[in-house]
Amino acid sequence: MNPVRIVAIALGIGAAAGGPAPDLSPATQILMENGSPYYVPATATVASGTPIRWDNPTPTHHTVTHNDCVTEAHPCLFDSGTVAPGGHFTVPGLPAGRYPYHCGIHPIMRGLLVVTDDRSTPSQL
């Protein structure tokens, strides 16, 4: 058998047995702003498992904090800590649900992430 064919067969077997493929979906981008609506878009809709990335193009520090992080009654699903100017924060994906969030430094900054079970749902920004 040709050595090239053996390598091709081995690679094919390795790819088939390698487990689930990583989600290579592009992240949905949300921008942090210093003025209203503060998070752009203010409400973002994505399919479950889709990565979400918040970018901070402002000259000010911000956070992205799930509202449940301020109570002990529910789990805190994401909290960026301080995101410096020019920085970003990414959540690899969330299960279906509604996730209100805010900036812990500037409480007037609020956003909503809506995650659907439908993988065919395009990111709605």
Kindly label every feature range from the protein language model.
Residues 7-16:
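Bacterial N-terminal signal peptides
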Residues 17-125:
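Extracytoplasmic copper-binding redox domains, predominantly the cupredoxin/blue-copper superfamily
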